[in-house]
Each structure stands twice: as C-alpha cells, then as structure tokens.
Amino acid sequence: MITIQPEIEILSTESYEDMLRRIEKIGRVCYKSEERIGEGTAEKFIAGIIKRGHESVIEHGSITVKVTCDRGVTHEIVRHRIASYSQESTRYCNYSKDKFGNQITCIDLATGFSYDLNDENDRKKYEVWQKAMEAAEQYYFQMLELGAKPEEARSILPNS
C-alpha cells in the first residue's frame, strides 16, 4: 500500500491538439490507462469513448482541474454537477495488475487532518488508520484471488 498527498492540477489548452490530448488524459483516468497515451492516440481514444456513450469526458474540452483527494470527497462534489467529473473507476480498475504496482493507493490521512506524528495520540490514530488500510488492501486482493470481479471487490476499498 502506498499513501499519497492530495493535490490539484489545473490543465488548460492553447490549441485544438492540446485540447484533444487533455480530453484523452482525463478520460484515461477513468480506465487507468494513462500509460497508453502517445503521439496521435487522442483522436482514436476520443472516438472510442463517444462510441461507448461516455460523452461526459468530452466536457473536459473547456477547463479541467485534476483533483487527487479522498474518494469520500469526490462523492460529495460529483453530486453537485456544476462541472464535468471523471474519476478512476474501481469498477473497471483491477489493482492486482502490474500497472498499479499490485497495490492500492490511499490519500494520506495525516495530511488531511494535520496530524502531528510527533504527538503520541496523533501517531497512534495514524497507525490504526494505516493498519486498517493495509487490511483493506489484503482483503481486496483476497476477493480477487477467489474470483471476484473488481466491481465486487471494490466494496472493501476505503471510500472516505
């Protein structure tokens, strides 16, 4: 299991080609296929998502803010559709595959709650959280080993 810091990245375009590349970059987040981005791949990818009816990704042709945060936070903001949202799909992404490093990724609790890891109580809370995340990862992979689909095993993953 790895922990990462929350972050925000504002993406903007200056040309038609840049806009297509940005739509592809954000669209591929949903399928966790960013490694397939290459020279000339954007138009084909966009045609494919349109064919599959995933048109909301096209809305990223205006302005896009990539937010790396807790899944619980995304569940709050996507309910208020004042913009277009695309997020990594735990339904389709199988974290036991090599492209994920065979591990889940969790947003670091200590950062979000400003824990002082030199403080004994904060450190103990953080250690309990870390053990819970590691257990969730273990049971997620166990479900997959038992033949569960990613969309079944995802119910074990942390959401807030």
Question: What are the functions of these language-model segments?
Answer:
Residues 1-160:
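Family-specific signature for flavin-dependent thymidylate synthase
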